């Protein structure tokens, strides 16, 4: 079963691109935020398992610090199915794109992410973790294929290191609306947990040049009695 930090890691495999890869999907994309521009998400996410909901709501701040370099900070408020709430695992990350589609055929980036210990004893992971992924993307006109994966150094207590991988295919239905599907897999993240696989669908809709809506729903298809029955994500994105 995904623990609170597992939720954060999975949902944090998100970023944005001109082709609308990344959010709202669990699989990330290699496109960094444009140089000297901002992408700010007001988001909610969670998982439904064993008739209980657990997840986070908060702000995801991204800045294009240099060409091909994105800096990210996430401040989440976490909750669980027992009524506990508090500051979850603050995240700090940097995405660096080292291959470009125009010259190399694919965009490829390295996007390490640090999860700080939760400030609350009741929600979130109680120790630090480190996600080390590679993400790639190929565009075909109005279609985009992106994904990749990596491993999480998450050893502490009953938790253990684990790996994840995913791929998504999206299509621009109109100039404002993009729909997509995804398959995502994660190995067991604790001694008493199981591997999980989900198949999800998402959409992005441009309200204007600077305001965007994102949504995702992904039911589990592997070990659903021990893992999340479904993952969800929604956000209002500001770009400028």
Feature names for model-found ranges:
Residues 1-26:
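Cleavable N-terminal export/targeting peptides
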């Amino acid at each position: 079963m995904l623990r609170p930090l597992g939720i954060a890691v999975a949902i944090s495999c998100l970023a944005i691109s001109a082709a609308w890869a990344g959010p709202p999907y669990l699989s990330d994309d290699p496109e960094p935020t444009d140089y000297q521009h901002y992408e700010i998400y007001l988001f909610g996410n969670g998982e439904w398992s064993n008739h209980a909901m657990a997840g986070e709501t908060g702000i995801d701040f991204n800045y294009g610090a240099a060409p091909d370099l994105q800096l990210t900070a996430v401040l989440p408020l976490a909750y669980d199915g027992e009524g506990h709430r508090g500051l979850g695992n603050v995240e700090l990350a940097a995405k660096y794109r080292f291959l470009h589609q125009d010259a190399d055929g694919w965009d490829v980036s390295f996007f390490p992410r640090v999860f700080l210990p939760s400030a609350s004893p009741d929600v979130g992971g109680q120790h630090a973790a480190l996600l080390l992924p590679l993400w790639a993307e190929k565009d075909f006109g109005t279609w985009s294929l992106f994904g990749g994966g990596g491993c999480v150094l998450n050893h502490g207590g009953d938790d253990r290191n684990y790996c994840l991988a995913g791929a998504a295919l999206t299509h621009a239905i109109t100039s404002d609306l993009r729909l997509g599907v995804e398959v995502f897999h994660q190995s067991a993240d604790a001694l008493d947990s199981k591997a999980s696989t989900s198949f999800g669908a998402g959409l992005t809709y441009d309200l204007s040049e600077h305001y965007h809506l994102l949504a995702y729903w992904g039911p589990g298809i592997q070990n659903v009695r021990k893992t999340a029955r479904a993952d969800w994500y929604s956000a209002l994105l500001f770009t400028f």
